[in-house]
């Protein structure tokens, strides 16, 4: 699946924010919250179609710079997503398992109705919660991902810093479990 043009524009806007940022992120209380690979055009504010819709619409990230390695074009840049820690800590975080308690599939559906119902059952709002899930690749279910929904990205909680070379990325992996998302992770 491909992201909508709205989400593509959202990614481009986030990327443009990081390019214009003159302040060292370490001095603003920012933390690394995820990574992804993106074409150079996205890193510099041009519209681009991205992949994915497993747990909803938005910007998909992985905990490390290598999370989307197999899905990215060879010349894709390495992007690090950062957020102000105080603001990020206030954002609700939820795991989205593959199936709900009624054994109904939630991943890769035409709409987000079941996911929204699941998030609401955890007493959170779907449009203001970060979503986490396993990123299945065949039988390997050890990878994880985070989805930044459009409403959160629109509020400019996040900045993106992109690097042409992998070795230029100094940020280490993020540990999603340390943020204690609500809900069932699944397997």
Language-model segments: what does each one mean?
Residues 1-10:
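Classical eukaryotic N-terminal signal peptides for Sec-dependent ER targeting/secretion
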Residues 13-31, 36-43, 49-57, 69-187:
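Conserved NAD+-utilizing ADP-ribose enzyme module
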């Amino acid at each position: 699946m491909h992201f909508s043009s709205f989400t593509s524009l959202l990614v481009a806007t986030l990327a443009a924010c990081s390019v214009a940022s003159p302040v060292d992120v370490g001095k603003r209380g920012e933390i690394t919250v995820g990574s992804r690979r993106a074409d150079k055009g996205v890193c510099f504010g041009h519209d681009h179609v991205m992949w994915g819709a497993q747990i909803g619409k938005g910007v998909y990230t992985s905990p490390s710079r290598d999370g989307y390695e197999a899905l990215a074009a060879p010349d894709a840049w390495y992007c690090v997503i950062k957020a102000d820690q105080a603001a990020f800590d206030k954002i609700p975080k939820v795991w989205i398992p593959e199936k709900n308690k009624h054994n109904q599939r939630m991943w890769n559906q035409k709409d987000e109705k079941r996911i929204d119902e699941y998030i609401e059952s955890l007493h959170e709002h779907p449009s203001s919660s970060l979503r986490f899930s396993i990123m299945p690749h065949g039988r390997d279910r050890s990878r994880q991902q985070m989805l930044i929904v459009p409403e959160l990205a629109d509020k400019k909680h996040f900045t993106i810093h992109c690097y042409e070379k992998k070795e230029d990325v100094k940020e280490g992996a993020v540990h999603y479990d340390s943020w204690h998302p609500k809900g069932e992770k699944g397997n």
